[in-house]
Amino acid sequence: MATKKTPVTDDAALPSFEDGVDLDQAIGDLRGVLKTDAEGSLSDFGDFGDFGSTDEVSTDNDLSAFGGGAADFAMDDFAAAPQVAGVKAPLGSGLSENMEMIMDIPIDVQIVLGTSRMLVSGLMSLEEGATIALDRKIGEPVEIMVNGRRIARGEITVLEDDDTRFGVKLIEVLSTRKA
């Protein structure tokens, strides 16, 4: 069976520029790059020499042939926080912003009362009012699952403020680390 292909519309294929300012800026940037490339004003990388040479490997740290700014680069502190427009970002600020985004992601938590195994014929013969026996007894802890992984165990309770609803009281939180 052939797959159904969705036609690409002009609106989906092109980025939308709400006003002409963004489009003019993008075109201007592209022209600048093309002009620089056409003039050949990009820095040379220097002569790499003979790679097949049997000469002894040089241990000098003169990297000026690789764009000229390498000496400054070699002395940079890699542990320093990144700078944007002259302002230093506090260490770990990106991590905390990402954590805030992650903490806002909704997840489904499943409470597993028990399981049952039956033949297809038994499943097909189920009718309204039938009782399915589970593999757990009354009072045994239930499993709390997230994404198919057991994260805790708990006891079924009735909510204090709403006696028409059930809840789960955690009795054991399992390690989240993979072995």
From Swiss-Prot:
It comes from the Bacteria. Pfam families: FliMN_C. GO terms for biological process: bacterial-type flagellum-dependent cell motility; chemotaxis. Gene3D superfamilies: SpoA-like. It is found in: Cell inner membrane; Bacterial flagellum basal body. It is a peripheral membrane protein. Keywords: Bacterial flagellum, Cell inner membrane, Cell membrane, Chemotaxis, Flagellar rotation, Membrane. FliN is one of three proteins (FliG, FliN, FliM) that form the rotor-mounted switch complex (C ring), located at the base of the basal body. This complex interacts with the CheY and CheZ chemotaxis proteins, in addition to contacting components of the motor that determine the direction of flagellar rotation. Belongs to the FliN/MopA/SpaO family. NCBIfam families: fliN. This is Flagellar motor switch protein FliN. The gene is fliN.
